[in-house]
Amino acid sequence: MKVGSKELEASKVRVIVDKDPVATSFEKWAQPGHFSRTLAKGPKTTTWIWNLHADAHDFDSQTSSLEDISRKIFSAHFGQLAIIFLWVSQAYFHGARFSNYSAWLLNPTSIKPSAQVVWPVVGQEILNGDVGGGFSGVQITSGVFQMWRASGITNETELYWTAMGGLMMSALMVFAGWFHYHKAAPKLEWFQNVESMMNHHLAGLLGLGCLSWSGHQIHISLPINKLLDAGVAPQEIPLPHELLFNQDLMAQLYPSFKKGLLPFFTLNWGEYSDFLTFKGGLNPITGSLWLSDTAHHHLALAVLFIFAGHMYRTNWGIGHSMKEILEAHKGPLTGEGHKGLYEILTTSWHAQLAINLAMMGSLSIIVAHHMYAMPPYPYIAVDYPTQLSLFTHHMWIGGFCVCGAAAHGAIFMVRDYSPVQSYNNLLDRVLRHRDAIISHLNWVCIFLGTHSFGLYIHNDTMRALGRPQDMFSDKAIQLQPIFAKWVQSLHTLAPGNTAPNSLATASYAFGGDVVAVNGKIAMMPIQLGTADFLVHHIHAFTIHVTVLILLKGVLFARSSRLIPDKANLGFRFPCDGPGRGGTCQVSAWDHIFLGLFWMYNCISVVIFHFSWKMQSDVWGTISEKGKITHITGGNFANSALTINGWLRDFLWSQASQVIQSYGSALSAYGIIFLGAHFIWAFSLMFLFSGRGYWQELIESVVWAHNKLKLAPAIQPRALSITQGRAVGLAHYLLGGIGTTWSFFLARIISVG
C-alpha cells in the first residue's frame, strides 16, 4: 500500500490531548471528601471538617499522577480567571449603574468618585455622603474612575457594555475549565513544553497584549483625552468607532495621521512624534504621566516582547533551548551550576510557583512605589485617598506573595526535591552552606535591630530629659541620608544627558518643579532627612527578619541538626517529641506562620511611613503666589524622630477622625475600626492557647451533654496546635488589616 503525502503528514502530528479522560458528573459534589479515602468515610470527630478544608485543594495528596495534578491546576486557573472577569465586570457594572462617573468627568478635582449607593435599611443610608455634583454615595478609592478616563470611556453606556463583555468572558472561562479537564485534557508533555510556553507567553500574552493596549491608547484614549483636557464636554466627543475609521477626524488632532503608514515603511518614524512622545514629567492639566508617553512605552514593550517570543527553539532547529541555557550556566566557583534545575522546574509546580510568587510579590511592591512617584492615570495624583489606598494595597499584596513564595519553596523542598538529581549544583551548594547563610542573616538582624531601635530609644530619652540638642535630628546631631540624596540629584540631572529630548525628569519625587492641579499638589520633590534615615533602617531591619524566618524555613525544610529526618514528617507537623530542647514550631509550615507576623510588622511600618510622609511633605495646596501648605504642616521631620512622636503625632493624632466618625458618612469606618480591633484581639486567644486546656474543657462540656442525653454523634476535639495557629494567624492579619484600612481611610477622606 502506498502512503500519500497527506497520510505522512498526519502520522507526524503529535496528539497532545486526551479525549474525554474524566466523565462529567455532579454525583461527587454530594460526597464531601470524595478525594480522600479517609475523609470520604465521613466525620467521626470535629477534626474532619478541618482536614476537609486543608486537603480539598492539595492535589498532591489526592493523586500521585503529575499529569492529573497538572490538569487539575490548569482547569482551576480557568476557574480563577472566571472569577477575575466576574469581579472586573461587577466593577464596571457599578460604574455604569450606581456611580457619578459622568459628573466626575466634568469636574474631577472637586467631585469625589462614588460607585456604591447603600440601600436605606436600618438607617445605614447615612453612609451615602455628599460627594459633590448632587450625588450621594460611598466615596470609592480604587482608582477605577481615573483608569476609565485614561482608557477613553466617556459615558455610563460604554461601562455597561464593557461589563457585559466581562460577563461573557467569565462564562467562556468556566466553559474552558470544564472543556480542558473533561473533554480535551492536555497531556503532561504539553505542560512540560517550556520553550513553546515561553514563546506564547512572551509574544502572545505580553507582546500582543502590550501592542493591543498601545493601539487602543493611540486610536481611542489619546484623542478622547486630548479633547477632555481641552475642556470639550464628554457628550460632544466623537464615539470610539468614529475615531477608529475616520482618518480626517484623527488628523485634526494628530497631523501625522494624514500620512498613514508611509512613514512607517519608509523608516521616517520621527513623523509619528506628535502622538508617540518622550516628554517625561507629568501633564500639568491632569497631574499624571503624559498619555502619549505611555502609549510610546507600551509600543516599545510590545516590540521587545514580540522579539523575545521568538527566542526559544520549538519546531524549527533555531533558537535557545532552556535546558541547554541552564546547564551552560556555570562559574568557576559554582560546581555544576544550574544543572538539574530544568528537571526540577518541569516536574515541580511548587518550585515554579515559588519563583513566580517571589517575582510577582516584588513587582507588586515596585508598582506601589511607582503609583505615587509617577501617577499613571489622569487626576489620580490629587485623589489622596485613592493614592494611599493603592499604595497600601500593592504593599500588602507584595508581602503576601513573598510569604507564599517561601511557603511553596518549602513545600517543594519537602515533597519534590531529590538530592540525587541536584548533586553539587547551585541549589545543593546553597543547602550545604545554609548554616553560614542563616547565621550571617541572624547577625545582620541583630545589628540592624539594635542600632535602628537604639537610635529611637536615644532620641526618646533625650527628649524626655529635655535635651533636644543631644538628639539625632536635622537641627542637632544630623544623620542625613547622603546616598539617597545623591541618587535623587542623579535622577534629577540624568535626563539632560541620558535622554536629551525629554522635557522633564522621570519623577518629581527626585527633584524639579511642584506639579499642582487646581492648586492641589499632585507631586513635588520629596525632601529626605534624619527622620527618614531612622525609619529607613527600621525598614531594613523588618525586611531582613522576615527574610531570615522565611529562608530558614526553606533551607531547613528537609532536615536540621535538631531533626535530621524532618522531610519524613512533612510540610507541617506540630512537634517531634520531647527531650531535645524543644522540637515544636520547627516545621516549614511554622516558619511561614512566623514569617507572616514579621511581614505584617514590615508592611505596617512602610505604609505608616508613606502615609505620614506624604501628608507632611507632599500632599496639600499651593497658593497663586506659590505658598505651599501641607496637610500636617511638615511635622514629619521633627516628630518622627522618636517612638513617642510616632505614637502621639501619627497614630493618636490621626486616629481622631476614625474615633469621632459616629453619626457621619464615615461611621462605617468607626465600626470597622472597633470590630477589627476585636478580631485582632480574638486572635491572641488562639495564639497564646494551651491545647490540653481546651480538650479538658471539651470533655467537661461533653460530660454535661451526656448527662442530659444530648450526646453528639460527632466527637468534639480541641483544635490541633497547627489548626489553632492557623486560626490565630488569619484573625491577626484580618484584624490588623481592617484596623489599618479604616484608620487610613477615615483620616484621609476627612482631610484629603
Swiss-Prot record:
It is a multi-pass membrane protein. Gene3D superfamilies: Photosystem I PsaA/PsaB (1.20.1130.10). Phylloquinone binds at W694. InterPro entries: PSI_PsaA (IPR006243), PSI_PsaA/B (IPR001280), PSI_PsaA/B_CS (IPR020586), PSI_PsaA/B_sf (IPR036408). P700 is a chlorophyll a/chlorophyll a' dimer, A0 is one or more chlorophyll a, A1 is one or both phylloquinones and FX is a shared 4Fe-4S iron-sulfur center. One of its GO terms (cellular component) is chloroplast thylakoid membrane. The chain crosses the membrane at residues 73-96, 159-182, 198-222, 294-312, 349-372, 388-414, 436-458, 533-551, 591-612, 666-688, 726-746. This is Photosystem I P700 chlorophyll a apoprotein A1. The lineage of its organism: Eukaryota, Haptista, Haptophyta, Prymnesiophyceae, Isochrysidales.
